[in-house]
Amino acid sequence: MKGTESHGHSTGRAAKLHDSAGNKIGATAVIAGGGFMTDLLKNGSADGVDRRGFLRCMAWAGAGMVWTVTGGIPTSKLLGQSGGNEGFQFVQISDSHIGFNKPANADVNATLQIAIDKINALPQAPDFLIHTGDLTHLAKPAEFDTLGQLLQGARTKQVHYVPGEHDNATDDGKEYLARYGKGAKGTGWYSFDHQGVHFAGLVNSAALDGMGKLGAEQLAWMKDDLRGRSASTPIVLFAHLPLWTVYPDWGWGTSDSEEALGYVKRFGSVTVLNGHIHQTMQKVEGNLRFHTAMSTAFPQPAPGSAPSAGPMKAPAGKLRGVLGITQVEFVARPQHLAIVDATLE
């Protein structure tokens, strides 16, 4: 199993989060130059995220800035600056939707290739890629074939996958599991270790019930998988749908994520990576850092800004600016993960 993402260049500035009346409502965020922030904390939003800590949504920003959190304090650095001589990097890509050919993007193969080119242009090849689901649009064998052919061109050959709901669209995930499920449990969940970091690929897209769902079997597996691990072990969870409630009206969350997150709260460093919503949103809650990635295929509206979620046609010439990849760097001393989002421009 396996996945991917990459980077770009931008300047940034620190900014306070305010509501529409100018009242301060959040922590200091780092905003990429050339983007704008969609603030879900505005007017004390009803989904509860305002009560759970630092949140920023950069639906159109395409950040080119690394952010890190140490002791709950976000700090930033320009993309390309090294975090140290020790550690490793990996790249997240998401929602490639191979097979999609509607006006929002008539050539998703080409935009995925641009993402791969960005990954290949990184100064240091990432150790591996993570793909957080919706590899394909209709789970057809030919779509999986095309994805595989494109990813063969990535300089980093190891890719970890988790499925999205589109990968289960026509056959309950049989084709996906036949290709990527070797050694996985259930509908495709698994874990692995890399240089002292424990990764768990979770499946919350196989049994949708209004929102994502992990289910009792997977939760029991997760609890057992984490049992006995030192609290100092850095943990990375990755799944397709967000493991925090972004916008329940559109099903952007996981109904039983609270139990899953309860299993990792004893660990000192937990990073949670997701896709599905096709835009970058980040939240820090204690020792948990949540991050959703841009798609390589098409954007979706910011939560609540349209009648419903779905493919959104970008203004002419702007598509690459709302698609992107995510580069993650693990720094061994002090232990933390730095995350860089970059558009395909």
Could you tell me what each predicted segment is?
Residues 82, 140-234, 256-271, 283-294, ...:
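Extended active-site neighborhood of metal-dependent phosphoesterases/phosphodiesterases
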